[in-house]
């Protein structure tokens, strides 16, 4: 299975918890907002990591959906 990861740039407040919890999937861009390092995750371990980051996001800016 594969999952698509996205971050709503208008919603993100740049607290970087996602990049801290899951640095293989998320990074901070030049504007101080989170962005995915990869658009599609095929590894279940990375999916679980990204899901944890999504649940920890204080403004619900992260979306994960089946690709």
Curated annotation (Swiss-Prot):
A single MF term (Gene Ontology): 4 iron, 4 sulfur cluster binding
At which positions is [4Fe-4S] cluster bound? 12, 15, 18, 57
What InterPro entries does this protein map onto? Answer: 3Fe4S_ferredoxin (IPR001080), 4Fe4S_Fe-S-bd (IPR017896), Fe-S_cluster_ET (IPR051269)
Top-level lineage group = Archaea
Show the Gene3D superfamilies listed in the entry.
3.30.70.20
Keyword annotations = 3Fe-4S, 4Fe-4S, Disulfide bond, Electron transport, Iron, Iron-sulfur, Metal-binding, Repeat, Transport
Q: What does this protein do?
A: Ferredoxins are iron-sulfur proteins that transfer electrons in a wide variety of metabolic reactions.
Its subunit composition reads: Homodimer.
How is this protein named in the record?
Answer: Ferredoxin
